[in-house]
Amino acid sequence: MILPAMSSLSRQYNKLCDRPDFDDPALRAMLRDIVAPGYAPEEELRRKFWEYAMLGLYLEESGALRDDAEVLSIAAGHEEPLYWLANRVGRVVATDIYGEGGFAVDGREADASMLTDPGHWAPYDYRADHLEVRSMDALNVDYPDNSFDVVFSLSSIEHFGQPEAIRRAAAEMARVVKPGGHLVIVTEVLVKAHPLDWAPLQVAIKTLSRGKRLDRATMRKRMMDAFRPRELQRDVIAPTGLAPVQPIDYTLSPSTYDNLITWVGDDMRPASGNEYPHILLKGHGSPWTSAFLAFRKPA
């Protein structure tokens, strides 16, 4: 089989989620193919759906959607791409710490029922015999080197804890990719520099407020689980030992800021007053959004 050259990719994949991306008919079509039916067009304007569509477009263009392909999802939850891929490749393995931690409560992504009844979460009919679900820690992937044609993780690695844990998870993902195979990591990136993103300053605020503000900040980790570009390079990209298939485009269009959503406690306050587009969010410092990173292991 001749593998497509990554230099000839038809679009910029390694980039931030940007409002004009949703104006692309191919992205919209892929989005609608992957997510559950029934969303109004304006409800599709969300960064999670962008992540799904970009994954589908990249795997389609790179020739990875094959009957003999084996795919591993890290911190998979019960997201739609698992079921979509089960209908298109030979084997999908979904892994997560199902039933453990904050993402396992109230029907959230790591609900324990995924281990025994993944069909409960399926957005449409899928080939159940093509999807396996395992409880597994992303820091210790229980597969030999070079096991999977595709490994992917969507907006999860930023939640793995201290930088050392994040680096180990990135290295583990790359380790189990077959030569010539693909690694996709989507994570969350701070789009501007802001003094409040400096962890020691957040700790000072936490101390002065007696823990009422920025209560999870530490000297080594800010409150918001998102990366500055240099942290992304250091803690996610470099530990894979792989080169991204393209340079990363960190630019955003002005229209992406039109509905900046500010997170205040448990409330989300969109600038326009409308829930969508749900693309760019702001907590304590810089705004942040999703970043798509695709890598290929040398054959």
Where do the model's predicted regions map?
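Conserved class I S-adenosyl-L-methionine
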Residues: H182-R230
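Class I SAM-dependent methyltransferase Rossmann-like catalytic core
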Residues: A5-L65
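Nucleotide donor/acceptor-binding cores
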Residues: R66-E70
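A short acidic, Gly/Pro-enriched loop at the edge of an enzyme's catalytic core
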Residues: M136-V151
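A short glycine-rich, Lys/Arg-flanked "PGG" loop and its adjoining helix->strand segment in the class I
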Residues: R167-H182
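A C-terminal cap/extension of S-adenosyl-L-methionine-dependent methyltransferases
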Residues: V245-A299
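A short SAM/SAH-binding and catalytic strip from SAM-dependent methyltransferases
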Residues: D149-E164
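Class I SAM-dependent methyltransferase SAM/SAH-binding core
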Residues: L72-S73, E79-N140
